[in-house]
Amino acid sequence: MLDIWPKLSQSPILQRFAWSPLIVGAYDRNRDLFELKTHRAPIPDALSENVTLPNYLGGLLVVHIRRGDFQGHCKYLQKQSCGYNAFNVFPEFSDRFEPPSDYWSRSTYYTDHCYPSSERIISKIESVRQNHGTIRRLYIMTNAKGSWLASLLAKLEQTASWDAITTSRDLNFTQEQGYASQALDALVAQRAEAFIGNGVSY
């Protein structure tokens, strides 16, 4: 998909892209999870066409941790020798996907990138945090089970001091907004100071 990016990036669908009032309203409902009080910009009525959103969520690191069906799906990706998908292979990105040829080393490599352990996740978070130096808040978007997520949060709090750690489970939606929860995650990740994604996840 990188071949089509120069044209796609100039297309009306991206040049004129804007978040819908539904998603803006969902953000406004949950903005305390993402913004520092001193950085908040007032948001008008969520149904207004003149709604403004913060362009940048300084100090916020967003992490996408996909679990659930991905445990089995990652094995399928290894079997098919799949790499990072779509735009996750931009040369500007620091992470590369270069699996070794040895089977067992390859299996470990896929697991680390596709379905990482808690320890691997925490190590990556700390690495990004140290490189930025200004990150103080963490938002985790995930479909992980509550017990696994609780264990990860406990380990994160033991590893370093955070001003706030929040997750997808902390979001509060109206019934209508709940159907578009992943779009809110995308909005927040787009504007965060830093984002750690899963390169093989769409």
Give the predicted meaning of each segment.
Residues 1-171:
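Core catalytic architecture of nucleotide-activated donor-dependent transferases building glycoconjugates
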Residues 180-202:
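A donor-sugar binding/catalytic signature common to diverse glycosyltransferases
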Residues 170-180:
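Conserved blade-ending motifs and adjacent loop-strand segments that build the rim/top face
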